[in-house]
Amino acid sequence: MNDRVIQMKGYAQRTSNEWPAVGLSVPAWLSDYSNGLVVKGNGNLVRWMHVTPWKQDVESCDRVGLIQAMPAGDSEKDRTGRQWDQRTELMRDAIIYNRNNPSILFYECGNKGISREHMIEMKAIRDQYDPFGGRAIGSREMLDIREAEYGGEMLYINKSEHHPMWATEYCRDEGLRKYWDEYSYPF
């Protein structure tokens, strides 16, 4: 970014980003606090999981300086027919709604790989509705599809010959749901 190499590190956050006892209906300052914890914890990226985050979190990331990967929606695999059409419509709407937010640097087409034809279709949507945004578009498990601009793997293995590889869940530590101490990352 700006001719400098950046090591991306951060969290895969549930898009709902809810707080205990409060739920989803949180004030903007709490979104800033929550996303600011990622930045204070030496993170510089949030990969929202599965669906587009609400506008309050998108704008919060702009304010605190946290890079975002924005998904539109997925079902953990490629789809066909009306289900695929709905995903492309959702990506179109998400791009239009959020294209003026500078912290979004990535558009994610799915939590699982999609076909080459579908990747080409998603790129065409990005090119039509955000032609000058400079955002990369890709998906998990797309390292073998030349049209994808990045690809991700869930656990560590770089299978890429041509693309930047993203270890999308490098440390999937579910243990903190049960055990927590002063050395745990921000909660």
Please tell me what each predicted stretch does.
Residues D32-F187:
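Substrate-binding/catalytic cleft of secreted carbohydrate-active enzymes
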